[in-house]
Each structure stands twice: as structure tokens, then as C-alpha cells.
Amino acid sequence: MRNVYDIAYELANALKESNEFKRFKAAKEKIEKDEKLKQMVMDFKKKQLELEQKRLQGQEVTSSDVYSLQQLYQIISLNPDIEEYLSSEMMLAKILADISKIIAEAVDLKDEMFGLLESK
């Protein structure tokens, strides 16, 4: 039987070689080279995190909160470099979430890891 850590490293290497990761890495490098774009992305992510923390703490997330974040996204994503960064980041995050779900389901931990309750 193969060592699970060796397989994890193989998966990590496969991810690094994927088109999705390469796209994300290139977009990230562009953002990091431009201080103004970097600050815009950081401000957006900060507001996004604040909204998520509010939700996780059981505080009400108002439609105004959501609208404000959506408006900010629409404004900053007018910049093609930011739009590319955010969309490539979202695609990479989806792949990582899918991989986590596949692993959790394979070892029967889906409910524990994702908080899903099945009615039996």
C-alpha cells in the first residue's frame, strides 16, 4: 500500500501543474506588482471577510451589506487584471473544495467535515 503522504504530495504537484493554478499564479503576480491593484483587492477581501465573520457569529447580514459588497466587486472587477485574479482564485478554490469533498466522502467523513446532516 502506498503512503498517504506520498499521494498527497503527488496531488499537490498535480495541482501546481494544472492550468487553473498556473492561471491563478500569473494573475496573482500581476496584482502583486501593482500596489494600487493590490490594495483594491485587499480592501475587497477585507470587506468580504468581515461579512463572513458577521454571518458566522450569528449576526444579521443585511441586504445592504450584501449589496455593498456586490457593488464593490462590480467596481473593482472592471479592471481586467483584478477580474482575472478573482475569477482564477474562485476556480482554484472550487477545485480545492471538490478535492476535500471527494476525500471526505471516500472516508465517510462528509457529515463531520461539511456539517451536513442526513435524515435517515
Swiss-Prot record:
Pfam families noted in UniProt: Com_YlbF
InterPro entries reported in the protein's UniProt record: Com_YlbF, YheA/YmcA-like_dom_sf
Highest taxon, organism lineage: Bacteria
Family: Belongs to the UPF0342 family.
Record protein name field: UPF0342 protein Csac_0863
